[in-house]
Curated annotation (Swiss-Prot):
Gene: LDB19
Protein name: Protein LDB19
Main localization, broad class: cytoplasm
The keyword Cell cycle is assigned to this record: yes
Organism this protein belongs to: Saccharomyces cerevisiae (strain ATCC 204508 / S288c) (Baker's yeast)
PANTHER family associated with the record: ARRESTIN DOMAIN CONTAINING PROTEIN (PTHR11188), PROTEIN LDB19 (PTHR11188:SF76)
A GO biological-process term: positive regulation of receptor internalization
GO molecular function: protein-macromolecule adaptor activity; ubiquitin protein ligase binding
Acidic residues bias spans: 416-430
Residues with Phosphoserine modification: S384, S808
Compartmental location: Cytoplasm; Golgi apparatus
Amino acid sequence: MAFSRLTSTHQSNHNGYSNSNKKGQSLPLTLSIDVESPPCVLYGSAMESSGAVLSGLFTVTVVDPYSSAEDKSLKNTESNVSTTSKSLKRKSTFGSALSSRLSSLSASTSNISPSTSSTSISHSPTPANLRIMAGYTKITITSVTLSLVQKIHFHKPFVPNISSMQTCMNCKTKITNMKSWEIQSNTQDLSVGSHSYPFSYLIPGSVPCSSSLGATAETQVKYELIAVVTYIDPHRNSFSSGHSTPRKEGSSSKKRLLQLAMPIAVTRSIPRGPDKNSLRVFPPTELTAAAVLPNVVYPKSTFPLEMKLDGVSSGDRRWRMRKLSWRIEETTRVKAHACPVHKHELRQLEEQVKIKESEKSKKPRSHIKRYGELGPQIRVAVNSLENMPSQRLPGEPGREQAPNSSGPASTGNVGLDDENPVNEDEEDQPGSEFIHPSDDALRQELLMQQQRARQQQLQQELKNNSSLFTEEVRIISKGEMKSGWKTDFDNNGKIELVTEIDCMGLNSGVSNPVMHASTLQTPSTGNKKPSINVACDIQDPNLGLYVSHILAVEIVVAEETLQYANGQPIRKPNSKNKKETNNNTMNVHNPDQRLAELSPIFANRNTPKVRRMGPEDITPVNSNKSNHSTNKEKASNGASNSNIVSVPTGAARVLRMQFRLTVTERSGLGISWDEEVPPIYQDVELLSPPCYELSINNGIKNKLYSTMSTPVRSEDDFVGGSDEDIGNYESQGLEPGPNVQEVTITQNKLTIPPTAHHYQPASSSQRSLTTVQSPPLESVVSVQGSVPFRGHVLTPHSTRDIRIQNFSDFLDSNRITQ
């Protein structure tokens, strides 16, 4: 309510602002918003998205009253007067701008009446003089607020069919305040110049994206940044337009309101993943269809549909493909919204719809068959667990499935029997795990979880005092394919095809985001709205907005029978045994359809494993006889095949399939705000911490000095002493010299070394490797190299007995083990 009033005042102010420009007046304030963050893109679904960061700079500029266009014209008149009447011009020696303009005014009036130029200001003030005297150096600001709001505008057919609600603006608009910044709440004076205020907000990942819903695209979801500034007009507080005396503050102080609205485009992008593989079976026939589709679909693009039909040929009958047609359907469900004044009317309408639905449920359900071009199908229903839009778990049977048709049509009449697939998409929900057919416990647990989620969703929607939904189903794209597939009738037969699904005509209305907005910019009304005809997928139970898409594919197949050219059916000897063997082979080679419904993994689990032929299985034959026999067989087979023809029986079937499509926007870089790499130290110019190189070098140097495991002596001791003396000191238990610095030894637990190998030095001819174990570590003597940065690295200067568990870790260091 508050924002609607602000919008109305903003419109009135805007009209007043345009009128004031005509009168020669200008606003003392200008507002501008600059967005510094990348476009607001929500990566991932509503459940897993981390949101998007919106940050920018809000600037309030107090306009300098002496730098306007009128002052420039005043300066031009001053220059003209100075050239024509140089003797009458007064040269100003003051530094202030006011005195210079007063002097120019006196010079300008001297051109008109030179005799009274000295008394023109005091006796007869002009409008220019009054304007300059009414100048200001600061403005009193009472409040400055910035808000990010979500606006939902409802339009037909998503407005309830009640006349009072269709004319109420509060029922047709829903505004939600997402974030508000109280920049200034107390009265404060702002001087002439620009005053900037930074803002930042993390947009939640569960909010719906900016979109236009419905066939007319008038129902819109949009986001706006609204800046509101209230101030006291300084022009009214100084001088009146017709008098030279200043007004009183109590009578002249009037608050003005200035508002700026900037649209924020919020889009959702689901990253591209692996393609979806779906399997459909069509009992009572032996046809199975496997389809491959991308997991996401973008507007203004095309995507391939790969399909393979198996079980086309069986015995003396086979199916020949005639046509493939496809269409993309968009289903939009919007919850009814009403203001507090009309809530009782919405409840009455909801009760009426409940009564109608209960009466319809008693009657047998009849399927609507679509023929030709149909407009959007609109239905009003009350939300419940049965019709709640939600994503099913894999393996859950569909509730809306009708019983399959039985038997083909008669051979005399050409009938098209509809074949509905038994199972839906197994990967409707991205990231869903596969459930094994025998794992009933896991299946029941997942079903219970989904049931609880639906109950919570229904309770959450019932809290909103409305469960009335308007559903619109419309076709947004369609096409057909009449040729271009490959057919193979060998063995069980198969049909393979690849077709392009055209979505180039779909437009979601996404354009370049607005990065700057100001009150100085006039709103552009000449541009026409783009023809928006699709909306991306939305699942928002809080607002009651659901948008989903389905790819419906229909394949027409005609039945054919095989017979000889003379019209006689194909009959082979031992028909009974042959039928039994054919049935056995069919049961073996055909996939188990029940398991095929669950996963393609079990489709070919009964395929026989052919044993490889060994040399004992091959029997020698005469080459002449074999060639003669094979030639006879080839000739007989060729003759028989040439006499066999296929005759259409007149029966046909329509194989209908539905695949869920996820329509989303392109991801661009595809990097969310929480996955971006932070700036390195060198990018921070002011007060930057030390760079990585210096810190790493210092850390290595300190580590080298701290890990010394032997005493270090000074250079004087190296001159007078030797390594043997130092060894004697340690063996006798005597203390070393006074200049020797003792360093503590850090002993770490070392792992047991692997088996070592060495050559036998005695025999040079036999240089075979022999495995030996490591020697006892108590008697190992280590010779430490010299201290770094002192002479040579490998020059030994001290020896010492070190009791350690292992010596293999020292092989890669600068120590020499003996």
